[in-house]
Amino acid sequence: MKHLALIGSTGSIGRQVLQVVRSIPDTFIIETLAAYGRNQEALISQIREFNPRVVAVREETTYKELRKLFPHIEILLGEEGLVSVATEPSVTITIVASSGIDALPAVIAAIRQKKTIALANKESLVAAGELVTTLARENGVQILPIDSEHNALFQCLEGRDSSTIKKLLLTASGGPLRNKSKEELQKVSLQEVLRHPVWNMGPKITVDSSTLVNKGLEIIEAFWLFGLEAVEIEAVIHPQSLVHGMVEFCDGTILSVMKPPSMLFPIQHVLTFPERSPAIGPGFDFLSNRTLEFFPIDEDRFPSVHLAKRVLLEKGSMGCFFNGANEALVHRFLAGEISWHQIVPKLQALVDQHRVQSCLSLEEILSVDAEARARAQEC
């Protein structure tokens, strides 16, 4: 049996994690849950179904309600509760299914307790890649990627000699605005931005997909996750979203992972790793998917990927600043304070102004993140 901690249980990834757990009986035990969203009814339902030892929440009203409903379960509040969920002694795999930097202290604590990390939280690596990966190496901890593209690369790289690897290729659907001209992009609406052609995701990541900032974040994440210093990391537009990642080797061979655009596949792969279990949904059908298209990213319309590569080259505090500033700008767009076409220019201006510093501690990282968000609110 695998004993799981699940951070972000009521979000999109968290719910799909539990779907996989249900589909493979007698394999997993949900030891702890953390839900920092406002979907109290969903969390109550999960607690009744999985009967975890410990539950952590952010809202005090939810905390009080859960203590009344479940007196036999340890209910915790705030960041300390999140860390407790991630580091519960009975847990062997800590699944980080939430988005945002709020999960970073729990990720670091779980690594120090030598928990295997199943990671769907790209912010942890973008903002604190050096700290997280250094701690993982020192503690002999494996980080298993849940993000579809990184999971595909992980499968292609498994057991390979790193000296034979030439290039990592991440695919991007192109987002909801991929076919719009530069002029049309000046006046897109919130409704257009949130209408993703392939994936059903939360609003923040859907906006990131529309600007292609998400792909830039994934390039940074891939650098820290796989630690291949001399290997080129590129992104290409693949509208069908059937090829999720490719690895090119020195002899010209390219390996890829192909599957339907569903997060259930990478989640199941990570939870059952290193074993494999029968798929819980239909797999890839070559006969009904005869067309696979690949296009270069138009950097004139979508300059964010180039900006992210620059951020990666500068390292230090730049990834943390880039991530925090982008998140604040996206929230301003969702609140109607700025237009879509202002997000990336404002982000670039903020990056240009940031003075890179070393970020070796959690406290330094959180300080830079707070600075980035404050600056993004003012610009």
Curated annotation (Swiss-Prot):
Residues bound to NADPH: 10-13, 38-39, 121, 123, 202
Catalytic activity: 2-C-methyl-D-erythritol 4-phosphate + NADP(+) = 1-deoxy-D-xylulose 5-phosphate + NADPH + H(+)
Enzyme class: oxidoreductase
Biological-process GO terms, alphabetical: isopentenyl diphosphate biosynthetic process, methylerythritol 4-phosphate pathway involved in terpenoid biosynthetic process
This protein's UniProt keywords: Isoprene biosynthesis, Manganese, Metal-binding, NADP, Oxidoreductase
Pathway assigned in UniProt: Isoprenoid biosynthesis; isopentenyl diphosphate biosynthesis via DXP pathway; isopentenyl diphosphate from 1-deoxy-D-xylulose 5-phosphate: step 1/6
EC number(s) given by UniProt: 1.1.1.267
SUPFAM superfamilies assigned: 1-deoxy-D-xylulose-5-phosphate reductoisomerase, C-terminal domain, Glyceraldehyde-3-phosphate dehydrogenase-like, C-terminal domain, NAD(P)-binding Rossmann-fold domains
Domain of life: Bacteria
Residue numbers binding 1-deoxy-D-xylulose 5-phosphate: 122, 148-149, 173, 196, 209, 214-215, 218
Cofactor dependency: Mg(2+); Mn(2+)
HAMAP family in UniProt: DXP_reductoisom (MF_00183)
Family: Belongs to the DXR family.
Designated name of the protein: 1-deoxy-D-xylulose 5-phosphate reductoisomerase
Natural source organism: Chlamydia trachomatis serovar L2 (strain ATCC VR-902B / DSM 19102 / 434/Bu)
